[in-house]
Amino acid sequence: MTEQELVESGNMKMEWARNHMPVIAIIREKFEKEKPLKGLKVGMALHVEAKTAVLVETLAAGGAQVAISGCNPLSTQDDVARALDTRKNISCFARYGCCTSEYYEAIDKVLDIEPDITIDDGADLIFKLHKERTDLLPKILGGCEETTTGVHRLHAMEKEGALKMPVIAVNDAMTKYLFDNRYGTGQSAWDGINRTTNLLVAGKNVVVGGYGWCGRGVAMRAAGLGANVIVTEVDPIRALEARMDGYRVMRMADAARLGEIFVTTTGNRDILTAEHFKVMPDGAVLANSGHFNVEIDMEALTSLAKSVKTVRHNIKEYDIGDRRINVIAEGRLVNLAAGDGHPAEVMDMSFANQALCVRYIAENTLLNGVHGVPRGIDTYVAKLKLESMGISIDELTSKQECYMTGWECGT
């Protein structure tokens, strides 16, 4: 494609996403009028695709100068990146298929604008800021983190006293994790798997590693597709939930012998390792829906393999002698590396939270550390979403409010 064709393709994708994100459209309209980010610079490291572009446009509409890089080497859509880079007050440094050094060079370019506020998905930008660009920290008003993995990293930094800026854990907003993590991941992970493999899910044994909100979504949609779902967990409460939800629950060592499709959703490393590869059924399909490519031990699988070949676009077959293991998108985030990511209507809420939290940081002084999304923002996003769906709900009467705050009424 020519440069112009790329830009036109990106613009078309962005328009489609924009038309299905009514909440952030309302926020953008307010930002355009009020300019709450005027004079501020926002540095971002997110998955550069159409929905993200709508968020970037919204921040720029609010008066910000925005620079963005990718947060995964395989999740950038180059046409959207090119289209973004044509916008006023927006610089995009993301590129699909970049190597590790190029990935961090792009993050460095984002930091070169000396941002006042950061937005991360996985905390790589904040990591770089704290490790190599500490001179920029005094200027930082705060940051936002989009995903579970990034929030875990930030809590670890905070615990060690290493976090030198305030960060709002947008992932922990109810209007984020209850919808984005569950319904978004559930749909988009299977979209990536199905469009890449073109295999039937019904009747197959599907092993879901982890039963957090992402794992719940993946398991729920697998069951809806007719799979026999097996869940593995380390948390006894979540394992019990999975069983009560109707799924088989067992150790991965046992599930590995049964699974035909494996989807990891833990945000942790070494969920599928050499001991599991050696006993998997011939032709097993492996996909990761966690942020980083550490859940499937690709180094171990590569060392076991007698040969590796591409058998379909975005699928590599590892022949380990007596069986073949198929890995989608090199074990990277399957819904974005092999698909278009979460549905626009879900990201509408997640990115509405991001935009409003950026404004909150701009208008308030926060202490260093990890902060929750203000309840008012979370509730406001839910109300706007309901309104966009044409849904009205009840309100408490004064008597009901009194009852809920009192203690004297009993039997």
From Swiss-Prot:
Its EC number is 3.13.1.9. Its main location: cytoplasm. Keywords: Cytoplasm, Hydrolase, NAD, One-carbon metabolism. This is S-inosyl-L-homocysteine hydrolase. GO terms for biological process: one-carbon metabolic process; S-adenosylmethionine biosynthetic process; S-adenosylmethionine cycle. It comes from the Archaea. Binds 1 NAD(+) per subunit. It catalyses: S-inosyl-L-homocysteine + H2O = L-homocysteine + inosine. CDD domains: SAHH (cd00401). It is found in: Cytoplasm. GO terms for cellular component: cytosol. Gene3D superfamilies: Adenosylhomocysteinase-like, NAD(P)-binding Rossmann-like Domain. Belongs to the adenosylhomocysteinase family. Pathway: Amino-acid biosynthesis; S-adenosyl-L-methionine biosynthesis. SAH is a product of SAM methyltransferases and is known to be a feedback inhibitor of these enzymes. As a result of this inhibition, organisms have evolved efficient enzymes to metabolize SAH via different pathways. The pathway found in methanogens differs from the canonical pathway, it uses the deamination of S-adenosyl-L-homocysteine to form S-inosyl-L-homocysteine for the regeneration of SAM from S-adenosyl-L-homocysteine. One of its GO terms (molecular function) is adenosylhomocysteinase activity. Its cofactor is NAD(+). The keyword Nucleus does not apply.
